[in-house]
Each structure stands twice: as C-alpha cells, then as structure tokens.
Design a protein with these regions (language model features):
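Protein-protein interaction and targeting regions used for scaffolding, dimerization, and localization
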Residues: 1-220
Length: 220
C-alpha cells in the first residue's frame, strides 16, 4: 500500500498551468517563461498556505505579536520573488521537462485539482500513531507530532521543488542562490513549527495533526 499527500490547487491556477503546457507541447514560438514563473509561484503559495496553516491558526488564537504570520509572509514573498526570476532565464524547450515533471504530480478528482507527492508508509504510520497519542491526551507527544509533520512537509519540498528544479539544469551561481532560498524558507517554517511544540496544548496540536492527516491518502 502506498501513501501520498494531496494538496488542493485552485481551478484557475491549474487552468493557467494547463494552457502553458499546451502551448509548450504545440511548439509555440511565444515565450512561456514569465507566464510559467507566475503560475508556479501561485501554485507554490497555495501549497505553502495549506501545509503551514497551523502557523496562521496559532497566530489568530495565541500570538499577539504576529510572529507566525510574519514567518508565512516571508516565505510567500521569497517564493513570489525567486520562482518567476528563476524560470525567466529559459527558452520554451528548456521548460518542457519541468512542466512534464510537475504535470505528473497533478490529479483531478470530481473537478477538484490536487498536487500530490508520495511519502514513506512508515512515516505515514508514525504520524497516525502520534495523532492517536495526542487524541488520548498525551501532552508529551506534541513536539514529536510537529517534528513528524516537518518530515512530511520536507518530503514534499523535495518532490515538488528540489527534484523538479534539477530539470532546469541551472548554472552554478543561480543554483546556489536558489538552494539558499529553499534552505532559508524551509528553515523559517520548520523552526516556527518546532517552537509551537513548546506552546500548544495537546487539543490544538491534535486538531492540526488531524487536519493534515486529511491530506494523506492510502492507495493500493
């Protein structure tokens, strides 16, 4: 049995991506780089807002400083700045491998579009076990639960950002810049989740873990 994470993508965002893919497959002479960079940044932001929604919830209910919201905004701003910039370098033919890679991560079910990535079955089981412990009132499980979710999220970063980035075969300078941006943004999110492990009670933590479990599906 395989397990995958399914994250919603807005229909209009997907429609833009599909149009760009069609243009590339038909050999359009019009550059698709700027349009693709824009739509990929929107897709990334939609995914980020879903997986880090606990930070926004925490900000609303617990934090008076807006610290979590600032973290989210820093991440989103970096994505919107660097993703279009990174794609803008390339001609249409160089974009095709990236678009084909990402198209394979997308699934449509009942007119709902998902971006998906696989996770190890053992990791999925550990998340489920952690959820059960939280539901039983185990306050000591909070930090471990959020650490496990960080692992699940980072698998997604690998499948949806690190691996497809290789399709573009950046030069050393650009690749190093992008790796730095990826490291910085993920570190911001992960450190904030880690800090929440010392601040949330088990009921709030359990709610978020259960929310994230809804993204995880077991497939034959």
């Amino acid at each position: 049995m395989n397990t995958a994470v399914f994250l919603n993508i807005h229909a209009n965002t997907y429609a833009r991506f599909a149009h760009i893919r069609t243009q590339l497959m038909q050999g359009s002479k019009d550059s698709q780089a700027n349009a693709l960079g824009s739509v990929l940044s929107e897709m990334a932001c939609e995914v980020i807002e879903q997986v880090f929604i606990v930070l926004l919830q925490e900000n609303q209910h617990y934090s008076q400083t807006g610290e979590s919201e600032k973290v989210i905004q820093q991440i989103l701003e970096a994505v919107r700045k660097y993703m279009p910039w990174s794609v803008s370098f390339f001609s249409n033919d160089r974009l095709v491998p990236l678009v084909e890679y990402l198209s394979k991560t997308l699934q449509i079910e009942d007119e709902t579009i998902y971006m998906t990535y696989p996770i190890d079955q053992k990791l999925a089981q550990r998340v489920e076990t952690s959820s059960q412990k939280l539901a039983a009132g185990d306050q000591q499980e909070i930090s471990n639960a959020l650490r496990l979710l960080t692992e699940v999220i980072d698998v997604g970063v690998t499948h949806l950002i690190r691996e497809p980035k290789k399709c573009l075969k950046f030069n050393f300078v650009v690749d190093k810049t992008l790796n730095g941006v990826i490291t910085m943004t993920t570190h911001l999110g992960y450190k904030r989740l880690e800090k929440l492990g010392t601040q949330l009670d088990h009921q709030v933590a359990s709610t978020y873990i259960d929310y994230f479990l809804k993204f995880m599906r077991h497939q034959a």
